[in-house]
């Protein structure tokens, strides 16, 4: 029960507009705001920013 409250699953959607997503867990205590990670988007074949989607 406590596991889902502290570290929920979040979707990271590509800012390149391809619709590609990653799914990861996030620690709400360390990152209360929306997270942005730079990851690989295979559709455009380059690294782009992925933002948390709610």
Swiss-Prot record:
GO biological process: translation
Top-level taxonomic group: Bacteria
Organism: Mycolicibacterium vanbaalenii (strain DSM 7251 / JCM 13017 / BCRC 16820 / KCTC 9966 / NRRL B-24157 / PYR-1) (Mycobacterium vanbaalenii)
Stated name of the protein: Large ribosomal subunit protein bL33B
This protein's GO CC annotations: cytosolic large ribosomal subunit
Database matches in Gene3D superfamilies: Ribosomal protein L33
S-S bridge residues: none
Cross-referenced Pfam families: Ribosomal_L33
InterPro entries hit by this protein: Ribosomal_bL33, Ribosomal_bL33_CS, Ribosomal_bL33_sf, Ribosomal_zn-bd
Keywords attached to this entry: Ribonucleoprotein, Ribosomal protein
PANTHER family named in the record: 54S RIBOSOMAL PROTEIN L39, MITOCHONDRIAL (PTHR15238), LARGE RIBOSOMAL SUBUNIT PROTEIN BL33M (PTHR15238:SF1)
GO molecular function: structural constituent of ribosome
Keyword Ribosomal protein tagged: yes
Family affiliation: Belongs to the bacterial ribosomal protein bL33 family.
Transmembrane feature ranges: none
């Amino acid at each position: 029960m406590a596991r889902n409250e502290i570290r929920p699953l979040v979707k990271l959607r590509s800012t390149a507009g391809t619709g590609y997503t990653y799914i990861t867990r996030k620690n709400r205590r360390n990152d209360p705001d929306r997270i942005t990670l730079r990851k690989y988007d295979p559709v455009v074949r380059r690294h782009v920013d992925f933002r948390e989607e709610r």
